[in-house]
């Protein structure tokens, strides 16, 4: 309703005027197709940021609030989320994971990959049309059921797989996500992405004053 929309607007406005949007890069140093990371402590905690890479994340253990576009959503153990390219977001973990001399550990597997991770030529093929369709959906942020057996298997094995198997597994799971997996869209249809680097730079200059 209108009250909730107004509340979200002012919360997001406060985020923009108190935090700089940081452009991050997750490009693999070894020329791999994408990055797989296993985290035991929160990364980019409370950092309002964006990156060209899509972010595909499984939170086995960890709770807090996800800010993405114009959406604010609690995250919890088991959540699986796909964030599209250049979508502003940040993960605000609960104090249990960031405060004190011995904060609790998280258990997270996260992948970062460019839209062209399997080459621009492959993406142009008719057989890869599912990727382009999924990339459009991911611009709204997608949250999947944590009890999906296929997604759970993917996240539990991807870090230990060979380089070739990683690549084929990611393509297969993205096809599944586009065609079969049930997802909740997080960002509202009316949200406009600041999709030009200059827009972010101008926003950050405004914040500096």
Protein language model features and the residues they cover:
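Aromatic/histidine-rich interaction motifs
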Residues: 124-153
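N-terminal regulatory/effector-sensing and dimerization cores
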Residues: 33-133
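Extended boundary segments
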Residues: 19-37
């Amino acid at each position: 309703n209108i009250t909730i929309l107004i509340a979200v607007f002012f919360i997001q406005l406060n985020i923009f005027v108190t935090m700089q949007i940081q452009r991050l890069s997750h490009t693999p140093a070894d020329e791999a197709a994408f990055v797989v990371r296993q985290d035991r402590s929160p990364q980019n905690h409370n950092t309002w940021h964006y990156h060209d890479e899509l972010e595909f994340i499984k939170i086995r253990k960890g709770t807090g609030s996800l800010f993405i576009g114009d959406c604010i959503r609690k995250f919890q153990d088991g959540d699986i989320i796909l964030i599209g390219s250049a979508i502003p977001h940040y993960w605000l973990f609960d104090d249990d994971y960031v405060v004190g001399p011995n904060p609790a550990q998280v258990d997270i597997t996260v992948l970062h990959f460019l839209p062209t991770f399997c080459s621009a030529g492959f993406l142009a093929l008719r057989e890869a049309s599912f990727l382009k369709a999924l990339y459009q959906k991911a611009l709204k942020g997608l949250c999947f059921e944590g009890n999906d057996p296929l997604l759970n298997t993917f996240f539990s094995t991807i870090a230990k797989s060979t380089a070739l198997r990683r690549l084929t597994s990611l393509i297969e799971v993205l096809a599944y996500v586009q065609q079969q997996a049930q997802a909740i869209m997080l960002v509202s249809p009316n949200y406009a992405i600041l999709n030009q680097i200059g827009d972010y730079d101008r926003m950050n200059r405004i914040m500096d004053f």
